Amino acid sequence: MKKKILFWVLGILGVLIIGGGIYAYNVYSSVSNTLKEVHQPLKRDQNNSNVGEKVSKSEPVSILLLGADERGEDKGRSDSLMVITLNPKNNSMKTVSIPRDTYTEIVGKGKSDKINHAYAFGGVDMSVATVENFLNVPINYYIEVNMEGFKDIVDAVGGVDVKNDLEFTQDGHHFAKGNIHLTGDQALAFTRMRKQDPRGDFGRQMRQRQVMQGVIKKGASFSSLTGYGDVLAAIQKNVKTNLTQDQMFDMQKNYKDCLKNSEDIQIPGDGHKAADGIWYYYVPDAAKQDLTNKLRTHLEVTK
């Protein structure tokens, strides 16, 4: 499935500015206040005045999209991890979905574990450091979305339309095959199912991208949204990023054509139970190195 995704999870954020054009400027004050509230620098960047230069100079950048799970036994873990690299020089984008059970070193913890546990151990700062170490590429920016509250964003845009390729029931909601409309609660259940899908986590990642696309499509019609206040409130409550408002504007201006040439990358590996009885996803060193080389080339990283 060819996907035009998560640059516009700035769609969850910036599409309110991006898609709305002149209309968005009529509510500039509300949008501006929201974007100031969602801004949360990484600890490593708080004394770094050069953190935003890559965007302003139209250099290749990377973004970690992190979906945080706030329910039950998964509370405090990252439910989804995607790395997006953007190169405005050749107008291209690559999106890497990282299986949440990937076994790797947790930077700052002194142990190896599932990559999604980094968030539980040390929040977004440890997640960024761990993903950087796993891929051996720099992560310039992050966008964190509270997946439990994501339903508020879906409802705020009036629900989303997706094409479902697998009939299943999850959390009391039945999803037929074909084109379906999802409310916020339904979208959350739709994106959480993986045990009934023979593709496992990869199938769930696909559904997450579909729902995100649906939000982006609705957000791009911002001028037709009468409840933009609800959208902004949902974003303010459920999204954090180290991107500033100016960087979002610059990204829209300088990077939007990257969507014209997008590539989605799945990480090859093997999942099985370890001696401790816990299921992990293992990525061969050779496969990881191939991925590292591809991303570093795309980001024009030479050191």
Curated annotation (Swiss-Prot):
Lineage: Bacteria, Bacillati, Bacillota, Bacilli, Bacillales
Primary localisation category: membrane
InterPro entries the UniProt entry points to: LytR/CpsA/Psr_CW_biosynth (IPR050922), LytR_CpsA_psr (IPR004474), TagU (IPR023734)
Any one GO molecular-function label of the UniProt entry: phosphotransferase activity, for other substituted phosphate groups
A Pfam short name: LytR_cpsA_psr
The protein's role, per its UniProt record: May catalyze the final step in cell wall teichoic acid biosynthesis, the transfer of the anionic cell wall polymers (APs) from their lipid-linked precursor to the cell wall peptidoglycan (PG).
Annotated protein name in UniProt: Polyisoprenyl-teichoic acid--peptidoglycan teichoic acid transferase TagU
Residue numbers on the Cytoplasmic membrane side: 1-4
TM segment ranges: 5-25
